[in-house]
C-alpha cells in the first residue's frame, strides 16, 4: 500500500489484516447455520479478524458474543435500508409497471439465483413456483443471468422461451425499477438475503425459497416466512396473503436510513 489507510470496510479483509490495517465488517454476525454456503465461511472468518463489527439485528450481536470475537460490536442498523429509503422517492416515479403491463398489488415478484435452487433443484423450483401461482396472480420474474444460463443449459433455447411465457420472465432490472416492483408487489418469492430485509422495510409479504435464513429478524418481526420449495407451504402462504390475513410485521429498530451515518461517526471517533 502506498497510502496510509485507517481501516478497510468489507472486501479485502484478509489482505488488510496482513497489512496491519483495521477491518470494519458491515452486516457482521449474520449466520445461516448452513456451512455449505460460501458466504457463511466468509462471514465467520471476516468477523474473526474485524476490529469494528457493525450489526443490523440483535441475533447478529448474540452470534458474535457466543463466538467470542475480539472486535468491538456496534449495533448501527442496516445500510441496505439506507439505500432503499434514499431511492424510494425516485422509484415511485418509475414506469416499469406500465412497461410490463401490471398493476400495484396484483402480481408476484420472483427472484431466484442461489446454487441450491439453480444448480441442484432448478426444475423443482420453477415448477413449484408456476404451479403455486397459476390462476392465483400474475408473475414478474426478472431473471438472473446465472438462472437464465442454467435453464438454457438444462432445456435449451426453445424451452427457455416456454418458461418465459409461463413465468413472465423479463430481463434483469436496475435497482430503481426493481424497487418499484418490490414496493408494489402483492408478494415476493425469493432466495435472496437482502430482499428479505427490503420487503420487511416495505411491509410487503415475502416467501423465502430456502430452508434457512441468516436474517431471522425478518421472520420474527418482519413480513418474511421460510417456505423452501415446499409447494404446500407456498400455497397456504399465498392463500393467507390473498385473503389479507398475512402478518403485518414491523420495521426493526435502527432501520431508519441512518446506519451509514452511525458507522461514519464511530470510525471518525476511533
Language-model regions, residue ranges each:
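Nucleotide-activated sugar donor-binding and catalytic core shared by glycosyltransferases
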Residues: 1-139, 147-270
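Conserved C-terminal portion of the radical SAM core fold
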Residues: 144
Amino acid at each position: 500500500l502506498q497510502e496510509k489507510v485507517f481501516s478497510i470496510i468489507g472486501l479485502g479483509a484478509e489482505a488488510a489484516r496482513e497489512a496491519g490495517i483495521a477491518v470494519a465488517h458491515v452486516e457482521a454476525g449474520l449466520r445461516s447455520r448452513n456451512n455449505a454456503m460460501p458466504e457463511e465461511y466468509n462471514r465467520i472468518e471476516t468477523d474473526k479478524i474485524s476490529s469494528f463489527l457493525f450489526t443490523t439485528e440483535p441475533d447478529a450481536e448474540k452470534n458474535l458474543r457466543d463466538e467470542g470475537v475480539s472486535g468491538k460490536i456496534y449495533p448501527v442498523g442496516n445500510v441496505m435500508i439506507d439505500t432503499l429509503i434514499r431511492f424510494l422517492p425516485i422509484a415511485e416515479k418509475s414506469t416499469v409497471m406500465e412497461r410490463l403491463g401490471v398493476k400495484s398489488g396484483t402480481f408476484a415478484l420472483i427472484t431466484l439465483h442461489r446454487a441450491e435452487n439453480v444448480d441442484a433443484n432448478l426444475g423443482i423450483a420453477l415448477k413449484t413456483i408456476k404451479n403455486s401461482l397459476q390462476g392465483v396472480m400474475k408473475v414478474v420474474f426478472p431473471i438472473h443471468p446465472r438462472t437464465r444460463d442454467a435453464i438454457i443449459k438444462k432445456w435449451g433455447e426453445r424451452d427457455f422461451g416456454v418458461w418465459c411465457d409461463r413465468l413472465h420472465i423479463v430481463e434483469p432490472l436496475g435497482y430503481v425499477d426493481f424497487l418499484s416492483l418490490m414496493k408494489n408487489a402483492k408478494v415476493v418469492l425469493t432466495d435472496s438475503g437482502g430482499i428479505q430485509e427490503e420487503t420487511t422495510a416495505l411491509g410487503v409479504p415475502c416467501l423465502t425459497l430456502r430452508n434457512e435464513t441468516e436474517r431471522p429478524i425478518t421472520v420474527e418481526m418482519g413480513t418474511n416466512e421460510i417456505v423452501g420449495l415446499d409447494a404446500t407451504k407456498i400455497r397456504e402462504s399465498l392463500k393467507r396473503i390473498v385473503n389479507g390475513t398475512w402478518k403485518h410485521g414491523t420495521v426493526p429498530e435502527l432501520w431508519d436510513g441512518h446506519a451509514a451515518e452511525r458507522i461514519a461517526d464511530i470510525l471518525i471517533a476511533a
